[in-house]
Amino acid sequence: MSTYPGGWPPPQNQQSNRRLLVVLAPIVVLLVAAAAIGIGLLARNAAAEEIPGTATAAAGGSTPANVLADGAVRVGESDAKVTVRVVMDLQCPACKAFEEANGKVLEDAVRDGTAAVEYSVITFLDRAGTTEYSSRAGNAAFCVANSGVDGYQAWLSDMFTEQPAEGGAGLPDSALIDIAESAGYTDPAVAQCITDRAYDGYLRTKTDEVLNSGVNSTPTVTVNGEQVTDAAALMSPNGLAVVIAAAR
């Protein structure tokens, strides 16, 4: 996590000292806030700025079905002995790398009952594009979950396969609808939800809650509540399988 350069020059006299106290007080508050969430997630604050020509996030918003109270989508048996939680932003390149390395591990674990997986999709990377792709994709995550979770992991895999490069326009809503339909989400209500950004407000509320809980990077992965920090487990092919097996 990045940090700010430390230290300010000492005041030269009492008058300058008083001026510095006035000027530095709000700066210190800002620095403390930045240190608390990490420089990477400060981008989220700027991302709240309205981007001309795109939809604007609504306050509040509807609550989708098939989600936990904290907004995560749980896939797998309710009594699974192992619970894996993945916090992700669908525009995050490291999240794509994690999915490529361990997506099948998680699908297999759900299929054979070894583990349940809770996917917590957040948005803080709208600044990485020009059309608020991060939040549009996050909204789509709740649109498909609201319709059912049976195809959710396949949908996630397809979303990361089609993840756009940072800095561009991202995928249009029509492409998000196509990906959903390819994963089996053919109900016209899903397409309408994606176009209307029906869960945009809900997504942003849950994002705030996740960030306030102490998450400061994506992907953040936990197994039975213990954060996985080993890079090999996160990014090596099938690396998470060993961690899941050890937690059984």
Map each language-model feature to its residues:
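Extracytoplasmic low-complexity, Pro/Thr/Ser/Ala/Gly-rich segments
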Residues: 46-113, 121, 245-248
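A structure-centric signal for secondary-structure junctions around beta-strands
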Residues: 81, 137, 217-218
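Stable alpha-helical elements in mature extracytoplasmic
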Residues: 102, 136-140, 151-155, 172-176, ...
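Amphipathic alpha-helical segments within well-ordered protein domains
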Residues: 141-142, 160, 177-181, 191
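Short hydrophobic/aromatic segments of transmembrane alpha-helices and their interfaces
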Residues: 75-77, 173, 182-183
